[in-house]
Amino acid sequence: MKMMDANEIISFIQNSKKSTPVKVYVKGDLEGIDFGASAKPFITGNTGVVFGEWAEIQAALEANKGKIEDYVIENDRRNSAIPTLDLKNIKARIEPGAIIRDQVEIGDNAVIMMGASINIGSVIGEGTMIDMNVVLGGRATVGKNCHIGAGSVLAGVIEPPSAKPVVIEDDVVIGANAVVLEGVTVGKGAVVAAGAIVVEDVEPYTVVAGTPAKKIKDIDEKTKGKTEIKQELRQL
């Protein structure tokens, strides 16, 4: 897994072409109307749908208002710097409603549940489950065969670029609604209890709980049984 450098991300955002894409349902005398260089019109007769950049389509609508009877615009972003990740060829289970930005790395057989928000530069290892409504901030890195519980937050670090991101090592289980702050490393095989706020590094194969999170014990057989990772949930 390759972690993106913060300066790479900053440069990517700075130099990206900002986009305000729209989807326009349009009705009228549409023959011959040029909706702009970026536009992709799908028009049959006097009705159709046009996809493209708002600045171009807005100009076309204004220039041809005498020919256009009506239109409805769908728009979900303004001057967006980062597109969402193309999911079609990723070998993972990604459920509807997850928001995953471009420049995110997702390992094979990972699971991304509904409502998860995953920011640019994040890394998700093979077989890791990101549960419902989890937030992975910029450059947050999660190893293999982890479970990040519902509603948890792994804080992101893009600025300042010198700051260290959150690193979750392999085989870690994080309970629901936990928060791991910037710069923290959670060691291999550790367990973070639900609702914990983790402000310092967690040793491998330990259990931490509380606010702020403190070590309560080493991993034992009982804990292993209660935090078992089920590979059946990760099969494609």
Swiss-Prot record:
GO terms for biological process: diaminopimelate biosynthetic process; lysine biosynthetic process via diaminopimelate. PROSITE patterns: HEXAPEP_TRANSFERASES. Catalyzes the transfer of an acetyl group from acetyl-CoA to tetrahydrodipicolinate. Pfam families: DapH_N, Hexapep, Hexapep_2. PANTHER family: 2,3,4,5-TETRAHYDROPYRIDINE-2,6-DICARBOXYLATE N-ACETYLTRANSFERASE, ACETYLTRANSFERASE. GO terms for molecular function: tetrahydrodipicolinate N-acetyltransferase activity. InterPro entries: DapH (IPR019873), DapH_N (IPR013710), Hexapep (IPR001451), Hexapep_transf_CS (IPR018357), Trans_hexapeptide_repeat (IPR050179), Trimer_LpxA-like_sf (IPR011004). It comes from Bacillus licheniformis (strain ATCC 14580 / DSM 13 / JCM 2505 / CCUG 7422 / NBRC 12200 / NCIMB 9375 / NCTC 10341 / NRRL NRS-1264 / Gibson 46). This is 2,3,4,5-tetrahydropyridine-2,6-dicarboxylate N-acetyltransferase.
